[in-house]
Design a protein with these regions (language model features):
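Short, flexible, mixed-charge acidic loops at enzyme active sites
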Residues: 58-61, 102-107
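A glycine-rich helix N-cap at a beta->alpha junction
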Residues: 64-67, 80-82, 155-174
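Small-aliphatic-rich amphipathic alpha-helix that forms the alpha element of a beta-alpha
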Residues: 28-30, 90, 96, 106-154
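Short coil-to-beta-strand
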Residues: 84-93, 99-100
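N-terminal amphipathic, basic helical "cap/leader" segment at the start of enzyme domains
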Residues: 1-88
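A short acidic, glycine/proline-enriched capping/turn motif at secondary-structure boundaries
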Residues: 51-53, 96-99
Length: 174
């Protein structure tokens, strides 16, 4: 699966496994992924169906506000055919409250907590991507964080202590 894992930019909305199995997969990976001092600061939100498409619509609307018209049109078209057209999106977060608690518990290593958090999140993203590949899904990793973090948090009532790290749209590769 590791050798087959790559970025797929043309996806379609076809479930290759039951969505409940994807939820179970997320739970399994979160439970087994190494974290600094077992702080378990990673948080994951799975968006499917209309929620998935709505999230990518929020990205498009955020880009509309900042891009010149010709760049916006190209970006919108890319998002529509590459990300929004897929089956779902995995949102990766880090819980800043949990990380701050770790800093307080381990003051000698407080300066390393952010680095460890990034390393742990990277392992989580890689494990998720590889596992989705095992199911036959294609995926890519996106970083529209600062453009959409507030609107996503507001729309889906995301804990304000959670910091958005990445978005992983997935679907059947075309």
């Amino acid at each position: 699966a590791i050798a087959r894992r790559r970025s797929y930019y043309h996806l379609k909305d076809r479930p290759l496994v039951d969505d409940e199995r994807v939820v179970e997969l997320i739970d399994e990976i979160l439970a087994t992924m190494p974290t600094p001092y077992n702080v378990q600061s990673a948080r994951v939100v799975l968006l499917l169906g209309d929620h998935h498409r709505e999230m990518w619509h929020l990205v498009i609307e955020a880009l509309r506000e900042i891009l010149p018209k010709e760049r916006f049109i190209a970006s919108r078209d890319k998002i529509d055919r590459s990300f929004a057209s897929g089956h779902g999106t995995v949102l990766f977060y880090e819980d800043t409250a949990a990380l701050n608690h770790l800093r307080e518990r381990q003051p000698l290593y407080a300066d390393n907590v952010e680095i460890w958090s990034e390393q742990s999140s990277g392992m989580l993203q890689f494990a998720m991507w590889t596992a989705l590949e095992e199911f036959g899904y294609g995926a890519s990793l996106q970083h529209y964080n600062s453009l959409i973090e507030y609107s996503i948090a507001e729309r889906w009532k995301i804990n304000p202590d959670w910091r958005l790290i990445a978005q992983m749209p997935f679907g059947e590769p075309i």
